[in-house]
Amino acid sequence: MSLISRLRAVVAGDDYLDSDYDDLDYDTDDHMDADHRSDHASGGALATPSDSSPFDLGGGFSGSNVIGMPGVGSTSAEVNLMEPRSFDEMPRAIQALRERKTVILNLTMMEPDQAQRAVDFVAGGTFAIDGHQERVGESIFLFAPSCVTVSNTSYDEASAPSMVSQDHDSVPSSSQQTGAAPVPAWEVTRAGGL
């Protein structure tokens, strides 16, 4: 029996533990061949596949060793609304994204520099899982995994206020001094024309 026909027999689920199994090119004595046939006939040395075997060649796939992805196949989508007070709470947002849950971050309770750091951190995690991100309002951001489609029909990018239009050498305005809302890094690059 050639190697290819033996592979076909294994894949097709044929009983490959028959006398053709010994047709390898080994030098054997005739009395060893007779002993092997008698053991095979009595079922002594060779084990036959049973129904309790984890390697069922002929039956369907049991799926007992398959680990599902979190959130796949669930009937409803989850949205987590988070109002963090410090950057230390950001890993929870990343974990929710990894579990294929949408996260809305309301960063109004954070200091502006910490809020900017938090937005950049969660945006990086969202990018790593091929997710989507959207600025919903002032200091409010939506981060969604790749299984969620985010569309925005009422947002006009040209009419959106931007803090990038200000010169870096000029004196900051009063809105920047009082803790204006953070602008995510991807908004800065879009407005900058890059």
Curated annotation (Swiss-Prot):
Disordered as annotated region, ranges: 35-54, 159-194
Protein's job: Cell division protein that is part of the divisome complex and is recruited early to the Z-ring. Probably stimulates Z-ring formation, perhaps through the cross-linking of FtsZ protofilaments. Its function overlaps with FtsA.
Similarity section: Belongs to the SepF family.
Gene Ontology, cellular component aspect: cytoplasm
BP terms from Gene Ontology: division septum assembly; FtsZ-dependent cytokinesis
Keyword annotations: Cell cycle, Cell division, Cytoplasm, Septation
Gene: sepF
Natural source organism: Prochlorococcus marinus (strain MIT 9303)
Assembly, per entry: Homodimer. Interacts with FtsZ.
Subcellular location: Cytoplasm
PANTHER family registered for this protein in UniProt: CELL DIVISION PROTEIN SEPF
One family name in Pfam for this protein: SepF
InterPro entries in alphabetical order: Cell_div_SepF, Cell_div_SepF/SepF-rel, SepF-like_sf
Stated name of the protein: Cell division protein SepF
Primary localisation category: cytoplasm
